[in-house]
């Protein structure tokens, strides 16, 4: 009897405990709904975008208030002086920036969830700013990178040619979206550093009276010695067609050696690309060959105060009409055979380096006059398409501030719609290698400038190797760092009929010149972007949810006392007066926090399974 009584008491206590637990949960749910209903639009989005709302009934109202207050205040940011002092004390070693890798990954991963974010900071002489914006109607996503480097604020004891001091900082990202901007439907989290990029360059012969940039390593000196002996028909003002090396499986690369005068000496500029000033250059529409217009020389005395050296890599069928690659990439629409623009990734990478001395006087009349009289107006344009990948490069300098811009446009086509023979993973990896190739070329711009003595007014700064034609069967190959070097090579068919292999593995081509190996800093954000665009094969076939921007575009309302009694189909809870509801195009309504969480992982209505957005407005990466 005693055991039976104890068992009965135990069951009663257990049932009472369960009932109390259920009551507490109901109270927490009611408090949760009241908390959400009282939030303004900005606070609600802030908590939703940072996944702070949790599940109704599992978190107290006090905890929600604490989370809201904490996310509003934000983590304490280190002062600029402390950050600058830390950079100087560590000698500006890029390896020190690796600690910021996790925050970069988190930020990039949140782009997919938040749609719009802003971030900025400074470390030593490197400042950066990051903004992410998405167009909810078209799903357009534009990714831009801007890095500002003030060489005068670094450690004065560092040598001017020190790579770690010259290269841009760790996490300088600026993301902007425009209605007409091309689209990167869904950013993917990045991983670790990329492998170093290798660039094999054939330079034009150095002419008498010119000074060659100082080499950093014996390997580079040997390379330049070999390339100096090679002859390139860059001095003829003719338009040769593209040549392909017979023993090379990769697209051959033309040599461009653009010298820049920074003192009183005059330099000549022999460029193997199409000159933007010569806008009358004829390009055959629909032709599989891209013609380059090579001027015998360019004017040394520029007519404008701002000198630009712009190298454009773009679709030959869509010529660029602007000298600003960012404008070009955002205003030119890329179309498919059916006339519809496929989703496209747009990456704008911008690096600004400030030269010592000129920066302090960059606004002075004397400096503007010196810049106008001594800096040539050498604008160079090159247009090409590699399997649909458009790239634009530019370099400009004004009053000691040198700017490099690399714009890459990558159309992301669906396998089923375009009939591509590649699998999804191979297509994604091909896109990755194309992106990294462009980053490697941009880095080579800065690498050549690092070889130039900034204190030498007559030092020559050659530009980066630009894909084009091969001279004398000598290949100048631009290779990109691959996030996974063990992956098989994925060649890309080009308009010229040649294959481009952009892996980081060394190619033992018989006609290749000595490689100029550029050990790129792993702290550079656009090198860490390798796996940012490398998708999981399993994720490619899974349905994706909507972005926060697209969700926010759906209509909302408050449940009134005169409304018919209804129940949210997600949480199975009846609506009460004041509840915020979100209405889908199919007319079904749900609690705003319930349906928002659903739509972050799904794109259909939970009841009727209809698509919330039409296919053309949804974000898709394949």
Curated annotation (Swiss-Prot):
Gene Ontology terms describing biological process: embryonic axis specification; protein ubiquitination; ubiquitin-dependent protein catabolic process
Alphabetized Gene3D superfamilies for the sequence: Zinc/RING finger domain, C3HC4 (zinc finger) (3.30.40.10)
Start-end of Basic and acidic residues biased regions: 216-242, 355-365
Low complexity: bias regions: 11-21, 272-289, 318-331
Region (Disordered) location: 1-26, 67-386, 473-514
Main location: nucleus
Reactions the enzyme catalyzes: S-ubiquitinyl-[E2 ubiquitin-conjugating enzyme]-L-cysteine + [acceptor protein]-L-lysine = [E2 ubiquitin-conjugating enzyme]-L-cysteine + N(6)-ubiquitinyl-[acceptor protein]-L-lysine
Tissues of expression: Shows overlapping expression with lhx1/lim1 and ldb1 in the gastrula mesoderm, and expression overlaps with ldb1 throughout early embryogenesis. After gastrulation, expression is gradually restricted to tissues originated from the ectoderm, the neuroectoderm, neural crest and epidermis, and subsequently to the neural tube as well as the head and tailbud region.
GO molecular-function terms, A-Z: DNA-binding transcription factor binding; identical protein binding; transcription coregulator binding; ubiquitin protein ligase activity; ubiquitin-protein transferase activity; zinc ion binding
Keyword Zinc: yes
Pathway(s) where this gene product acts: Protein modification; protein ubiquitination
Effect listed in the UniProt record for changing residue 591 to A: Almost completely abolishes suppression of secondary axis formation and organizer function, and disrupts ldb1 ubiquitination
Database matches in Pfam families: zf-RING_2
Subunit and interaction comment: Forms homodimers through the C-terminal region. The N-terminus interacts with the homeobox of LIM/homeobox factor lhx1/lim1, with lhx3/lim3 and lhx5/lim5, and with the N-terminus of ldb1.
Protein name: E3 ubiquitin-protein ligase RNF12-A
Lineage: Eukaryota, Metazoa, Chordata, Craniata, Vertebrata
């Amino acid at each position: 009897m005693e055991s039976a009584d104890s068992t009965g008491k135990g069951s009663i206590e257990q049932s009472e405990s369960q009932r109390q637990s259920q009551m507490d949960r109901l109270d927490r749910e009611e408090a949760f709904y009241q908390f959400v209903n009282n939030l303004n639009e900005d606070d609600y989005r802030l908590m939703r975008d940072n996944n702070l709302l949790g599940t109704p009934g599992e978190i107290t109202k006090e905890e929600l208030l604490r989370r809201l207050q904490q996310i509003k205040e934000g983590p304490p940011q280190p002062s600029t002086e402390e950050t600058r002092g830390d950079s100087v004390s560590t000698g500006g070693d890029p390896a020190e920036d690796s600690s910021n890798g996790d925050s970069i990954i988190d930020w990039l991963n949140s782009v997919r969830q938040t749609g719009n974010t802003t971030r900025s900071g400074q470390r030593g002489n490197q400042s950066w700013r990051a903004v992410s914006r998405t167009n909810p109607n078209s799903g357009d996503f534009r990714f831009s990178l801007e890095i500002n480097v003030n060489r005068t604020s670094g450690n004065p004891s560092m040598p001017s040619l020190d790579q770690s001091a010259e290269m841009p900082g760790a996490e300088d990202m600026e993301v902007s979206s425009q209605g007409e901007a091309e689209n990167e439907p869904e950013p993917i989290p990045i991983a670790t550093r990329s492998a170093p990029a290798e660039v094999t360059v054939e330079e034009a012969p150095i002419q008498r009276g010119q000074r060659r940039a100082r080499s950093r390593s014996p390997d580079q000196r040997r390379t330049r010695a070999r390339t100096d002996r090679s002859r390139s028909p860059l001095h003829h003002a003719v338009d040769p067609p593209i040549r392909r090396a017979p023993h090379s499986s990769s697209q051959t690369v033309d040599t461009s050696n653009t010298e820049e005068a920074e003192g009183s000496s005059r330099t000549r500029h022999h460029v193997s690309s199409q000159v933007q000033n010569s806008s009358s250059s004829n390009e055959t529409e629909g032709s599989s060959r891209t013609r380059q217009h090579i001027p015998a020389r360019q004017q040394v005395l520029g007519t404008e105060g701002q000198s630009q050296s712009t190298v454009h890599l773009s679709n030959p069928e869509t010529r660029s009409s602007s000298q600003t690659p960012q404008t070009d990439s955002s205003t030119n629409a890329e179309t498919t055979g059916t006339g519809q623009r496929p989703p496209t990734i747009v990456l704008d990478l911008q690096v600004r380096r400030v030269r010592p001395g000129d920066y302090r006087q960059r606004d002075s009349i004397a400096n503007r006059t010196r810049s106008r009289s001594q800096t040539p107006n050498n604008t160079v344009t090159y247009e090409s398409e590699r399997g649909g990948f458009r790239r634009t490069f530019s370099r400009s300098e004004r009053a000691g501030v040198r700017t490099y811009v690399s714009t890459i446009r990558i159309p992301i086509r669906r396998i089923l719609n375009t009939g591509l023979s590649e699998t999804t993973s191979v297509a994604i990896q091909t896109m990755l290698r194309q992106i990294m190739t462009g980053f490697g070329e941009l880095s080579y711009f800065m690498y050549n400038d690092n070889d130039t003595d900034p204190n030498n007014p007559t030092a020559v700064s050659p530009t980066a190797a630009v894909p084009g034609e091969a001279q004398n069967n000598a290949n100048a190959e631009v290779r990109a760092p691959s996030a996974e070097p063990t992956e098989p090579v994925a060649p890309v068919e080009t308009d010229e009929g040649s294959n481009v292999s952009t892996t980081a593995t060394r190619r033992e081509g018989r006609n290749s010149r000595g490689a100029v190996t550029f050990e790129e800093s792993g702290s550079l954000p656009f090198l860490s972007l390798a796996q940012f665009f490398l998708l999981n094969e399993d994720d490619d076939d899974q349905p994706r949810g909507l972005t926060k921007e697209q969700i926010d575009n759906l209509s909302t309302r408050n449940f009134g006392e005169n409304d018919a009694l209804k129940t949210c189909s997600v949480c199975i809870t009846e609506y009460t007066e004041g509840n915020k509801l979100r209405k889908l195009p199919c007319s079904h309504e749900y609690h705003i926090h319930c349906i928002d969480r659903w739509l972050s992982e799904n794109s259909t209505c939970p009841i009727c399974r209809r698509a919330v957005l039409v296919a053309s407005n949804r974000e898709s990466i394949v």
